[in-house]
Amino acid sequence: MVNIILLIVSALIGLILGYALISIRLKSAKEAAELTLLNAEQEAVDIRGKAEVDAEHIKKTAKRESKANRKELLLEAKEEARKYREEIEQEFKSERQELKQLETRLAERSLTLDRKDENLSSKEKVLDSKEQSLTDKSKHIDERQLQVEKLEEEKKAELEKVAAMTIAEAREVILMETENKLTHEIATRIRDAERDIKDRTVKTAKDLLAQAMQRLAGEYVTEQTITSVHLPDDNMKGRIIGREGRNIRTLESLTGIDVIIDDTPEVVILSGFDPIRREIARMTLESLIADGRIHPARIEELVEKNRLEMDNRIREYGEAAAYEIGAPNLHPDLIKIMGRLQFRTSFGQNVLRHSVEVGKLAGILAGELGENVALARRAGFLHDMGKAIDREVEGSHVEIGMEFARKYKEHPVVVNTIASHHGDVEPDSVIAVLVAAADALSSARPGARNESMENYIKRLRDLEEIATSFDGVQNSFALQAGREIRIMVQPEKISDDQVVILSHKVREKIENNLDYPGNIKVTVIREMRAVDYAK
């Protein structure tokens, strides 16, 4: 029993211990399970986070790969499009090239057809011309046949007439016929000789003028109507004016020159149209400035002194010019007259330098023609001497020059040259003509005389506008400093007969609308051209 109880107790104890052990183990297992669960949860969280990271990485990688693939696809598409476009362009280019070649062939074929058409037209014209020529020749042959028959009848009649003539009458008839034939031949030869002489004369004259102009180089300074005098300082202006202007009034009254004192620093201007009086005033003013004594009495003294000095300078100018031109044995009065031309101007051109140049040109021309060179130079030098005193003596400078040339026993050729160089009388020597030509060369070229460039250009422009104002005028050109207008007309509008009428109309309009020195030559040219090509 006890054993049973012990057994039962032992069993109970074993149960209790087993339960306790089992509880402990269950608790440990639970704790282990919880720990395992926690670990599993942590691992799950870690795995989930890692999975999310991996998923994000995979997503980004996929995006990058997708973007790269898209770019690659885009590049491939662009490359294919480029290749396709190039293929299309190449096809278009080849088609355009073919079209261009086709157009070129068509143009060449058209040109060939045009040329053939022109050739056919020209051949047709040639055939028409030949046909017309044959017709004309046939008519001409018929006319000549009629003339031959008529001549045969006339000769027959003449023979019948001669048969009835005496020997003297027959001789007279033969001489008359011979004279008529010779008269016609002589007239033809005379006309040909005159034409040849005229052509050679014109060419020789041009050559002579060209040689003369090339061998002479003149120097010119444009003359003015004012002279500037430089002062050491502006204080000198007050001394020149003087108290209440008495000094300047004295100088102006004694010299006849306007003394202009303005704001221009250290300059006094002398204005006057008489170069001699202006030069005397300049010399006087410079002497007053150098001397320092400026008052009316001193001014009168210096003016008189400089007048005498001016006479000596005039004589020196005349002697130097006479020596330069090679004109010895000139009368002293003529030397003084020529010296006065140093202070005489004509349209701004110094007359003494002009006279020297005319003398040299006339001498060159005379030498080329075998004339008296010394006489030609002397005549050219003296041709304008009347201008030195034409303001003091009544009459033109030509009349005054003739009178003084006769008075001082100059050569008759010199007298006639002075009288004829402006066309007042007819020249009676070759030298007179040469001096007139030299005078025109020296004075009429552009720039020798003071015609402003603006007026000069305007005159040429007006001359050309007058010519082009007529219907049928193609071009017009003003030549030789406005001394010739050359007009080119349209041949389809202006006939040969109308050319003459046009030249007269242009001449009349120029005379009515322009002011000009000398003469203007109007030349109208009508030119017809025919151009063809040999194939």
UniProtKB/Swiss-Prot annotation:
Coiled coil (residue ranges): none
SUPFAM superfamilies: Eukaryotic type KH-domain (KH-domain type I) (SSF54791), HD-domain/PDEase-like (SSF109604)
Biological process according to GO: mRNA catabolic process
Enzyme class: hydrolase
Keyword Magnesium attached: no
EC number: 3.1.-.-
Tree of life domain: Bacteria
Stretches that traverse the bilayer: 4-24
Cysteines joined through disulfide linkages: none
Start and end residues of each stretch annotated as Disordered: 118-141
Keywords, alphabetical: Cell membrane, Endonuclease, Hydrolase, Membrane, Nuclease, RNA-binding, Transmembrane, Transmembrane helix
InterPro entries with a match to the protein in the record: HD/PDEase_dom (IPR003607), HD_domain (IPR006674), HDIG_dom (IPR006675), KH_dom (IPR004087), KH_dom_type_1 (IPR004088), KH_dom_type_1_sf (IPR036612), Ribonuclease_Y (IPR017705), RNase_Y_N (IPR022711)
Start and end residues of each KH domain: 225-285
HD domain sequence ranges: 351-444
Pfam families (UniProt xref): HD, KH_1, RNase_Y_N
GO cellular component: plasma membrane
Subcellular location: Cell membrane
GO molecular function, one term: RNA endonuclease activity
Family to which the UniProt record says this protein belongs: Belongs to the RNase Y family.
HAMAP family: RNase_Y
Function as written in the Swiss-Prot or TrEMBL entry: Endoribonuclease that initiates mRNA decay.
Name the record gives this protein: Ribonuclease Y
Species whose genome carries this gene: Streptococcus pyogenes serotype M1
Taxonomic lineage from the root: Bacteria, Bacillati, Bacillota, Bacilli, Lactobacillales
